[in-house]
């Protein structure tokens, strides 16, 4: 599910082929007399997401900022006037052990332009490849996750995909 900044509701994007996340870290090293004595690694609150999926046309036009008031209805454009908006992304996935996991990325922005492959005579519609930068929210976090089996709150399970917010997942 995706919600573009300034909108009230998440839109369904339930046709995801693959999702690959990489969260950034920073390592601080303490040296004494030229030898490493201590290392500390911390998350930076940002990262990247690579998605391979089918995107509804309305969502595609929004996340690439392709709508122009000066163009006829049904005509879209991409170029120097396209400013990628920030958006939130939520997912319900299976982990490597077949456990249901909820994922949320509260502050995202596309870091790549439109990229599509069209093949005449293809048996299947090609998925879009999108590179997404993850940014920290007001809590300094760029990703939230929860195993369904560990969630005690039915409200969180029901609201995660369509109404994710920091308020929803805060401890009571």
Role assignments for model-derived ranges:
Residues 6-8, 98, 140:
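Intrinsic-disorder/low-complexity loop/linker signature
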Residues 4, 95, 137:
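Acidic surface patches and DE-rich sequence motifs
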Residues 1-63, 109-124:
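Solvent-exposed edge beta-strands and adjacent loop segments
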Residues 41-105:
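Structured, beta-strand-rich domain cores
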Residues 11-16, 101-107, 144-148:
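Short amphipathic beta-strand/extended segments with alternating polar/hydrophobic composition
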Residues 108-172:
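Mixed-charge, glycine-accented linear interaction segment located at domain edges/termini
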